[in-house]
Amino acid sequence: MYEQITRNKWKSFFLVLFFLGLVFALTWFFGELTNLGPQALVLAVIIAVAMTFGSYYASDRIVLAISRAKPVEKKDYPYLYNTVEGLAIAAGIPKPRCYIIDDTAPNAFASGRNPKNSVIVVTKGLLTKLNRVELEGVIAHEMSHIKNYDVLVQTLAVVMVGVIVLLSDWILRTFLWGGGRRRSRSRSGKGGGNAGAILVLVGLILAVISPLIAQLIRLAVSRKREFLADANGALLTRYPPGLASALRKISADKEPLEVANKATAHLYIINPLLEFRGRVNRLFSTHPPVEERIAALEKM
């Protein structure tokens, strides 16, 4: 179990590292293309930091509003409240605030910029359709997302995708407006010749494919964090079959979650939107296949 957790952490780390490398590669080429040099990197960093802070501090309020989640007190759902409180103590973090979505489809998610400002959201369907150990498994999974700062990781990943798309757009527009051609001719005049042309070609190819690569990396990070939350959640309850049974039951439920959309689907323990199967489709999925998650839990 501990080896799987460590392995998932390292995979997530290297994916984010590759993400950063892509951002810096695009920024360097944009600087070369426009003669801005290091100024392009400074500009990209400023934009990334501003977008990150905005998303980071407002993410929980935005998600709660989109999901139409309502806060609950201990007197309303004492078992939910006590379960969250007990698992928070076991995880060593402050108790997250509890919210509920008035929907009969079973599902749940966690949000918040850090453990001190976190929420756990469940649907009414989750409370009525899952038994005690299954509910504990789901809450432990969401608690692990909070403890692992997964909201921060996902926020950074989304922002990096935005920065990469922005840089790619700037590069393509700059080249189409003639900046790239002038830069290429300038290099040729200085003896750059073929090297300058190759640089422009490589940069343009990178600008075209980078948004797709960035999106695939973001989704891969999301899938790895789900595996990590499963493993940590099972470690928290000391009963992996509880979470495995919950995943099986939630994925088998056919009721649609009315408030779900593409902007929030990646947050839920099971993607509430229809996903197509197949090797290619899996690359664009926010979650690992449920069968693989259950199999990993059963091996613990």
What kind of feature is each model-predicted range?
Residues 1-21, 33, 40-42, 47-199, ...:
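Polar-ligand-bearing catalytic/cofactor-coordination segments
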Residues 203-210:
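Hydrophobic alpha-helical transmembrane segments of polytopic membrane proteins
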Residues 23-28:
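N-terminal signal sequences
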